Amino acid sequence: MSNTVAVTGGTGFIGKHILASLLSRGYTVRALTRAPRNDSTPHLTWIQGSLEDKNALAELVKDARYVVHGAGQVRGHNEDVFTQCNVMGSLRLLQAAKEGGYCERFLFISSLAARHPELSWYANSKYIAEQKLAAMSSGITLGVFRPTAVYGSGDKELKPLFDWMLRGILPQLSTAETKLSFIHAIDLAQAVAQWVSSDVPQAQTYELCDGTESYRWKDLQAIAASARQGPVRLIPIPLYLLKIMADISTRFSLLAGKEPMLTRSKICELTHPDWSVSMQNAVDDFNWSPGISLTHAIHHRLF
């Protein structure tokens, strides 16, 4: 029986950890890449193409018993940018997997943001993708991961925040009582491999974090103060200033021919009051538990 896992998003910072985790467990991996790669190995084959390329997707999922869909659009200046990749691209991949005839399990890496689709274009696109994938997954076990904020080696989004924390400055982007949560990319990758390896994977949605249900800004302040052995100043950033920053980011990104990360739509996610996580079903269903707490990561600079 095939031991092949087809992976999208393998060139991204999370995807690189997923590839490493799967390879360490002895799986043969076939991964999608937009740019040509010359680093294939006996157990890792790169397929050049994109989620818009049906021929590449057919080659990607050929003989693959498992599909891990980690590719996604996280930057964008309008709703359509997210819909085309996160919704339509996901549906094309599942359709290719069904037509290939070998796929038994399909894992969609969504986002905790999908819990509140009304917040942003990104959140809504992930939620819609979840619903549409579920509707067309007959005959294939569909798993959905909703990881919270992911950080780790290669991350460019949370690293600046952690760097400033260790310099003694912590920008507070929402109210003091906001519930935050985090997960290290290594733990997320191990959760992926554990789900794939499970004897009886459940068709279920899983929220994932580092084991701490929620942090508040004062908790981050205390973690950073302990790590740097010095004071950390917590500086609230007013909403109007975040909006100005988002407008500037959007304008300059588009002028540079790039999609912006910080937009007014994204601000609604950043300032949402509750990103707490309950992950007991992941522990119960496929015996996964995280190994890297935020405290450990900050103290040992694992980002």
Annotate each predicted stretch with a short phrase.
Residues L32-R37, L51:
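N-terminal Rossmann-fold cofactor-binding loop
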Residues V5-R25:
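N-terminal Rossmann NAD(P)H-binding glycine-rich loop of SDR-like oxidoreductase domains
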Residues T83-S90, L107, K126, S181:
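Short alpha-helix in the Rossmann-fold core of NAD(P)-dependent oxidoreductases
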Residues G76, L112-N124, V150-G154:
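Conserved catalytic-site region of short-chain dehydrogenase/reductase
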Residues R92, K156-P160, S174-V196, A203-E207:
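Substrate-positioning beta->alpha
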Residues Q131-S153:
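Conserved beta-loop-beta element that borders a ligand/cofactor-binding pocket
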Residues S198-M261, M279, I292-F303:
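Mid/C-terminal beta-alpha module of Rossmann-like enzyme folds, strongest
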